């Protein structure tokens, strides 16, 4: 957005109904602010904070015919990119706070759910059941769940459903291979 747009100027019609243009700009700015520390330069201590596979590094250097400087630069980029993916997850998750009846719990609170949606009038599920609360587990992409996290997520949902018969649990992929609304049947 240009500065005039962020200050309330209306260069284009704002189409999103659940969030004002001003709040959207603030949300984007908060996400960009999270990138901040990752842009600081790397020293050897910071570089070694993550465990690096030296064997893979040697293979990659040889196969890609790269210099050590290029390999270190690539590793720094990889580490930053991994952290930035978490920040994009923050963007996906916390934008729900602007949607009516949605609540984004603090990290690790309220059962560790990413989003909780409540509607006193009830929410009709595709099978016809009506519940008043939906617990959401969000994943950035379809490939972010390995078998361990699939099992953990399934057990978390199963536990919630056993303790609250007036709810449903949804697994939401922010960036899915294709848009779908299906029952999740994990293989654990």
Language model: regions and residue ranges:
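Catalytic cores of nucleic-acid endonucleases
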Residues: 140-188
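Short N-terminal edge-element motif at the start of the domain
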Residues: 83-108
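Basic, glycine-/proline-tolerant helical and adjacent loop/strand elements
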Residues: 108-113, 147-149
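Short, conserved, surface-exposed binding loops centered on an aromatic residue
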Residues: 106-107, 126-127, 159-163
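Short, intrinsically disordered, charge-balanced linker/junction segments flanking boundaries
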Residues: 7-11, 117, 185-188
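Conserved catalytic cores of phosphodiester-cleaving nucleases, focusing on short active-site segments
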Residues: 100, 114-145
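Generic detector of solvent-exposed, compositionally biased contiguous segments
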Residues: 33-47, 132-154
């Amino acid at each position: 957005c240009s500065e005039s747009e962020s200050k309330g100027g209306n260069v284009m019609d704002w189409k999103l109904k659940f969030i004002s243009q001003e709040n959207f700009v603030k949300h984007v700015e908060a996400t960009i602010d999270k990138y901040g520390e990752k842009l600081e330069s790397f020293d050897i201590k910071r570089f070694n904070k993550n465990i690096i596979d030296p064997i893979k590094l040697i293979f990659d250097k040889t196969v890609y015919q790269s210099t050590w400087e290029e390999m270190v630069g690539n590793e720094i980029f990889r580490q930053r990119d991994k952290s930035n993916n978490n920040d994009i997850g923050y963007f996906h998750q916390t934008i729900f706070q602007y949607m009516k009846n949605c609540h984004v719990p603090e990290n690790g609170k309220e059962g560790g759910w990413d989003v909780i949606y409540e509607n006193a009038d009830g929410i009709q599920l595709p099978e016809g059941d009506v519940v008043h609360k939906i617990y959401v587990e969000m994943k950035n992409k379809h490939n972010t769940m390995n078998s361990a996290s699939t099992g953990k997520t399934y057990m978390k949902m199963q536990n919630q459903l056993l303790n609250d018969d007036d709810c449903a649990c949804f697994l939401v992929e922010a960036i899915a291979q294709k848009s779908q609304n299906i029952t999740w049947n994990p293989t654990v």
